[in-house]
Amino acid sequence: MKNLFTYSSFLLLITLAFVSCQKKDYSTEINPILDKYLEAWNEGNLEILDEITTLDFELRINPSFEAKNSRDLLKENISNTRMAYPDFLVTVDDRLFVSDTAVVIRWTITGTNKGKGTHPPTGKRANSNGFSIIFFAEGKLTGEWLAYSDLTWVKQLGFKMTPPWIAEE
């Protein structure tokens, strides 16, 4: 009987050790929220952001990464992007779940510049690769750091880089 108890205790300890060392799959909790976030960007469904983001959502976009701290500013950013690029689309290429509070997404964005934005519409299509680090807490998105090549994007729209010494002549 003593051997059975010792053997059972040993098996229980080994089982607990293996279970506690297993990496948790955060994707099952986070993927549905990410899919709704992508819906906001890809379809312009801004109301869904009320459900999945915190009021003080912090958006940081290159090159300055200056914080825009509010859900309303996020909605404005998405709305302005979709106004300038009505067919704007984010395609997720890869997801790396860091923890239950952060995921890194590698993506490709595409869009045709048909609407007014920071410049008159060019009618040209552009695409760029980039990545986002998206942060979570208690089942809601709390922020995103977003990076891509602005230069790649604007060159595809037909903009040219002019060195300062040429502009001065």
Task: Give the ranges of each region predicted by the language model.
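A short acidic/glycine-rich loop-to-helix N-cap element
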Residues: K24-D25, T118-G123, T152-K160
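Low-complexity, intrinsically disordered terminal/linker segments enriched in charged
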Residues: T142-E169
